[in-house]
Amino acid sequence: MFVDDDSLIIYSTWPSTLSDSSGRVIVMPDNRSFTFKEGFKLDESIKSILLVNPSSIDLLKIRVYKHRIKWMGNIFVLFEQENIPPPFRLVNDK
């Protein structure tokens, strides 16, 4: 997923699929990245938030905080999980 330079990244586990606006992979957290347990502030310079693997409580906390400070930006949610094939094989009858 491509992440804007003016986005805030909030994560529970760091994803392996983030790229910045120039196409470089963001390998490790940087100064615009926080865990859900850390404190952070939203201001007008932040245009969007990327939530990575949030729990339902994390989503609710972010939504309440966004509403309380009247922040007008976008929230994007990224869920990462293993792609496990089904335990059976699909067979075409033709």
Curated annotation (Swiss-Prot):
Chief place of localization? host cell
Report the GO molecular function annotations: ATP binding; DNA binding; helicase activity; hydrolase activity
Q: Which GO CC annotations does the UniProt entry carry?
A: host cell cytoplasm; virion component
Give me any GO biological process, just one: DNA-templated transcription termination
InterPro entries linked: A15
From which residue to which does the signal peptide run? Answer: none
Location comes to: Host cytoplasm; Virion
**Keywords in alphabetical order:** ATP-binding, DNA-binding, Helicase, Host cytoplasm, Hydrolase, Late protein, Nucleotide-binding, Phosphoprotein, Transcription, Transcription regulation, Transcription termination, Virion
Quaternary context: Part of a complex composed of the kinase OPG054, OPG092, OPG100, OPG114, OPG115, OPG142 and OPG157.
Its family remark reads: Belongs to the orthopoxvirus OPG142 family.
Q: What does the protein in this record do? A: Late protein which is a part of a large complex required for early virion morphogenesis. This complex participates in the formation of virosomes and the incorporation of virosomal contents into nascent immature virions. Required for the stability and kinase activity of OPG054.
What is this protein identified as? Core protein OPG142
Report the source organism.
Answer: Variola virus (isolate Human/India/Ind3/1967)
Give the gene name. Answer: OPG142
